[in-house]
Amino acid sequence: MKIAPVILAVFFVTATLRGSEAQSSISSSTDFQKAAMRLRENALFKLEPQVVAGTNFRSGFNRYPWKRGIVTTVFWVGERPTANNPVPNYKSSWDPRWAQNYGGLDDPDPSRRKNFIPAKFVPRQNPFYVALPYNDTTRGTTKPEARRAVPWFKQTFERPGKSVLKGRWIAVRRGNRIAYAQWEDCGPFRTDHWQYVFGNARPLPNLNQGAGLDVSPAVRDYLGMRGKDVCDWKFVEARDVPPGPWTKYGDNNTFVLQRRGANLFLVDRNNAYGMRKRMD
């Protein structure tokens, strides 16, 4: 089915070239062959079905699918270890001075909070944060599976050992309410379950009834959670995050940095590509 148009194309160029001999536009048989091949390639290009990059992928808020029915627990910066949470949260997987950089204990007691932040101080980092059970780095290098598992790896990777996950935005849904938060730690319990975080697997059993998401007190309060709960979550690009209490505070907050006029490609590379269209 594709041969006949190509023959016609070659016939066309032959006739055209013969008719223009008086003008000497083609001066040799070599030039003739090159011109014929160009027309042949153009004919094939027009005959082949064209695939536009990205047409098979969802865009905008629907680019990433929801992870539904995930047992969700609450954690906080400065949290002390307990039987069900043996790892203290003075440091995170990516920040050895997390509590210090945050500004102190992110007290979860509702009576000691106001407008989604601790009543005693304004946090220096975004109070809307989460943990998911995968870390793309270990011992100063990048895990080998991260390159194929993380959808935005190619865009944001800078060097081995620097996370492409820290600070990425996710949406967390409970009922008809959706909160937005940044990925700032790894857990609960695991840091290796990329098949769940980026694939179709479900969270693995653990001491908290198979919990697959930790959320901060600010996320808890916005969603109206009462301790352990069940939520849905998904990744979102920064440009698809609507204004809200999650865009107000923090030196690590994409939107605070943007308002300050910072170069996101230098200070928030993991979200910079996701903000490009919003800035345009």
Please report, for each region that a protein language model flagged, where it lies by residue.
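Bacterial N-terminal signal peptides
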Residues: 6-15
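Sec/Tat signal peptide C-region and signal peptidase I cleavage site
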Residues: 17-21
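Positively charged n-region of N-terminal signal peptides that target proteins for export
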Residues: 1-5
